Amino acid sequence: MENLNIVTLTGAGISAESGIPTFRGKDGLWNKFKPEELATPEAFFRNPKLVWEWYDWKRQLIAKAQPNEGHKILTKMEEEFPNFYLITQNVDGLHQRAGSKKVIELHGNIWKVRCVECGNERYEYTTPLPEIPPKCEKCGGLLRPGVVWFGESLPVDALSRAYELSREAHVFIVVGTSGVVYPAAELPFVAKENGAQVIEVNPEETPITKIADMHFKEKASTGLKKVYDYLREKYGSKG
């Protein structure tokens, strides 16, 4: 169905199956820190070396991870349905590594670095980083991770596009997100108010469950397989 708009919102639950921890709780080396103590502009400018050591550790974990079946099913959906879009709260880049092309990153990307002085932004895939904290090759300024920290606004372009897609969605799929981090958590409600069918995939109930037309109470990979089969059966595909 050429004009069927399918929008999917993903959270940490889909990456958990790739072995990426949520970076809360008992993560050994860093468990004495809470993410909200390190992932802030204040923490970064107070101690950029400490914050970068944490991100360097996270980047190394993510580099070893592989996209899982859930990521791959979303890639298949994009290939089959022309108006399929993916909005993610994740910063790990696993959707792109799985082959997804139409990805809107609400919280940035851990593989991006941005200079706090001149604003130059680029991808940096080296792990571990040769220098901590890394410096800008253009001006020598301090580089920061290209992610959204606590207390920062989401990128305006990504957020406005996410709202636009949510308003236009016929089917809105929510996968592995807690439904408590705003403004992302509002998107399924925006879709619902505009007539979309909301499908949730999450082993737990969330604030989104009450508005979901279908809830697959299971992990991302198995739940998404069922959603994929349902969409193909109901709407067919271009092929």
Curated annotation (Swiss-Prot):
Compartmental location: Cytoplasm
A GO cellular-component term linked to this record: cytoplasm
GO molecular function, one term: histone deacetylase activity, NAD-dependent
Domain of life: Bacteria
Enzyme Commission (EC) number: 2.3.1.286
Domain Deacetylase sirtuin-type: 1-234
Keywords (A to Z) from UniProt: Cytoplasm, Metal-binding, NAD, Transferase, Zinc
Cysteine-cysteine disulfides: none
Active-site annotation: H107 (proton acceptor)
Enzyme class: transferase
Residues binding NAD(+), per UniProt: 11-30, 89-92, 176-178, 202-204, 220
Main location: cytoplasm
Metal-binding among keywords: yes
Pfam families on file: SIR2 (PF02146)
Transcription regulation is among the record's keywords: no
InterPro entries on file: DHS-like_NAD/FAD-binding_dom, NAD-dep_sirtuin_deacylases, Sirtuin, Sirtuin_cat_small_dom_sf, Sirtuin_class_III, Ssirtuin_cat_dom
SUPFAM superfamilies: DHS-like NAD/FAD-binding domain (SSF52467)
Reactions that this protein is recorded to catalyse: N(6)-acetyl-L-lysyl-[protein] + NAD(+) + H2O = 2''-O-acetyl-ADP-D-ribose + nicotinamide + L-lysyl-[protein]
Cofactor note: Binds 1 zinc ion per subunit.
Chain sites annotated for binding Zn(2+): C115, C118, C136, C139
Cofactors (names): Zn(2+)
Similarity comment: family membership: Belongs to the sirtuin family. Class III subfamily.
Task performed by this protein: NAD-dependent protein deacetylase which modulates the activities of several proteins which are inactive in their acetylated form.
Full protein name: NAD-dependent protein deacylase
Organism: Aquifex aeolicus (strain VF5)
